[in-house]
């Protein structure tokens, strides 16, 4: 495991090809670039989470080797592979777009995955999460009404097997944040502030963190 790199540069610099290439080459994966060819009102475009944000999440200590992470809308697999590599956790990516899923499967062959990463081609709203999953990551992969259905599946899993479970929401839209903060099953924790990593003062540059109540 390499020493975590601290990124304190603006947004344009953070997504420069040189910065992307450093991590892409180290991990042996290809995940860069935005793709909105299959986006619609239900599913948002593919845009990988910046590596500097993932570094900050890994540095938080909230995800450890003992954890099993689900990345909803995993795209080409960056989040799953990076966090498994840096924290030692097991990671499972859920993706509905077969083309992106196939690219993730190719990336999963990287030694960085070390048999701790897997990807599933599935509709997140219908997917039954494994009972060992205890962390979930979201980067606005789908519309709010779909998120509600996904949360329902997470709650169902907790009813089958009560356990601590933490949710991470990067760059949340205002309506999503309001919904989450008002939800009776969610306990808000200290968010991970990422505004200093980018140009300007974008209030959405953060990772919201919630603990899920097993029962009301």
Regions found by a protein language model. Name each.
Residues 77-81:
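Glycine-rich SAM-binding Motif I of class I
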Residues 145-205:
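C-terminal substrate-binding/active-site "lid" region of AdoMet-derived donor-dependent transferases
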Residues 104-105:
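Conserved SAM-binding loop
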Residues 114-122:
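Conserved SAM-binding strand-loop segment of SAM-dependent methyltransferases
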């Amino acid at each position: 495991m390499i020493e975590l790199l601290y990124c304190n540069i603006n947004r344009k610099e953070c997504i420069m090809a040189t910065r992307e290439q450093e991590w892409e080459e180290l991990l042996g994966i290809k995940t860069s670039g935005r793709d909105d060819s299959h986006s619609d009102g239900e599913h948002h475009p593919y845009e990988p989470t910046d590596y500097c944000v993932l570094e900050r999440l890994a540095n938080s200590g909230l995800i450890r080797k003992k954890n099993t992470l689900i990345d909803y809308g995993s795209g080409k697999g960056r989040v799953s592979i990076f966090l498994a590599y840096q924290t030692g956790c097991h990671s499972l990516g859920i993706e509905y777009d077969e083309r992106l899923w196939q690219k993730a499967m190719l990336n999963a062959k990287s030694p960085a995955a070390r048999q701790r990463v897997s990807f599933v081609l599935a509709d997140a709203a219908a997917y039954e999460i494994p009972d060992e999953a205890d962390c979930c990551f979201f980067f606005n992969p789908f519309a709010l009404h779909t998120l509600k259905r996904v949360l329902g599946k997470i709650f169902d899993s907790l009813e089958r097997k009560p356990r601590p479970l933490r949710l991470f929401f990067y760059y949340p839209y205002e309506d999503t944040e309001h919904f989450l903060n008002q939800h009776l099953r969610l306990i808000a924790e200290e968010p991970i502030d990422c505004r200093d990593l980018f140009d300007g003062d974008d209030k959405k540059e953060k990772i919201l963190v919630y603990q899920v109540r097993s029962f009301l």
